[in-house]
């Protein structure tokens, strides 16, 4: 019954009240993060059960009333010491190799088909598409502000919706180049993106979105009084729709 009650709160396309676990994955990076998390939780569950069982057994059986005379082999045991040294080391190796593999895969930026500059300000994001220019030979760029609660339309998310979403094509290697006026952090959970933004320094994050959709994120570094207003909305569309959007931006 408990699992049935939680079913609707475990995997979500967007944040919901009282939601737990991860949002639905929409990129290979996020799928890898979720798989690593689930594997580690499996190891932790086994460790928790084993240690709890051993502690309860020791407390119940090795007390002064039941065993007034200490066992002569309990002061030192080479075998048990080898077991509790080698076993944790082996478990850490099982966790470390997939973790390092995922870390380097996320750090390696493929040759991107699209580059988007994202710059953090107090307290909004501005975006630029350096590969495309409009009729005045200016880069396509815009600012993205939070939509006030009073201006929300039906179906929009409170404290997440923005006035200008980032539009990128699905099934396309995209690189986000990130900078900031003060320290920010560009994070979008469904896509597995989280990159710190520092003044005077460029950081980079890559993403490959599996399908169309809208994915929300927020600044993950406390950056001032309106930190909670630095929302991120990335909309993935088909390549055809992306080209139509680009045409409108170039002409407009």
Swiss-Prot record:
Residues annotated as binding Cu cation A1: 184, 219, 223, 230
Listed cofactors: Cu cation
GO biological process, one term: ATP synthesis coupled electron transport
Superkingdom field: Eukaryota
Catalytic reaction annotation: 4 Fe(II)-[cytochrome c] + O2 + 8 H(+)(in) = 4 Fe(III)-[cytochrome c] + 2 H2O + 4 H(+)(out)
InterPro entries according to UniProt: CcO_II, CcO_II-like_C, CcO_II_C, Copper_CuA, Cupredoxin, Cyt_c_oxidase_su2_TM_dom, Cyt_c_oxidase_su2_TM_sf
Transmembrane region(s): 40-59, 82-105
Residues at which Cu cation A2 binds: 219, 221, 223, 227
Protein name: Cytochrome c oxidase subunit 2
UniProt source species: Emericella nidulans
Organism classification: Eukaryota, Fungi, Dikarya, Ascomycota, Pezizomycotina
């Amino acid at each position: 019954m408990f699992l049935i009650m939680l079913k609707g709160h475990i995997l979500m396309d967007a944040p919901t009240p009282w939601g737990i676990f991860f949002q639905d994955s929409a990129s290979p990076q996020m799928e890898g993060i979720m798989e690593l998390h689930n594997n580690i939780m499996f190891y932790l569950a086994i460790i928790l059960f084993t240690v709890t069982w051993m502690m309860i057994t020791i407390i119940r059986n090795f007390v002064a009333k039941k065993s007034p005379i200490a066992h002569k082999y309990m002061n030192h045991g080479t075998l048990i010491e080898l077991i509790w040294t080698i076993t944790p080391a082996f478990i850490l190796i099982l966790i470390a190799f997939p973790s390092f593999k995922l870390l380097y895969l996320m750090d390696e930026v493929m040759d991107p088909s699209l580059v988007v500059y994202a710059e953090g300000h107090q307290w909004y994001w501005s975006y630029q598409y350096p590969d495309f220019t409009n009729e005045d030979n200016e880069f396509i760029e815009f600012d993205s502000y939070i939509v006030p609660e009073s201006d929300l339309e039906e179906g929009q998310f409170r404290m997440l919706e923005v006035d200008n979403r980032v539009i990128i094509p699905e099934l396309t290697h995209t690189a986000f180049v990130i900078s900031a006026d003060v320290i920010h952090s560009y994070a979008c959970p469904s896509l597995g993106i989280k990159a710190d933004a520092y003044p005077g320094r460029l950081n980079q994050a890559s993403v490959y979105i599996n399908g169309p959709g809208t994915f929300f994120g927020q600044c993950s570094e406390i950056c001032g009084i309106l930190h909670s207003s630095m929302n991120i909305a990335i909309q993935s569309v088909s390549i055809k729709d992306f080209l139509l959007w680009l045409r409108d931006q170039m002409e407009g």
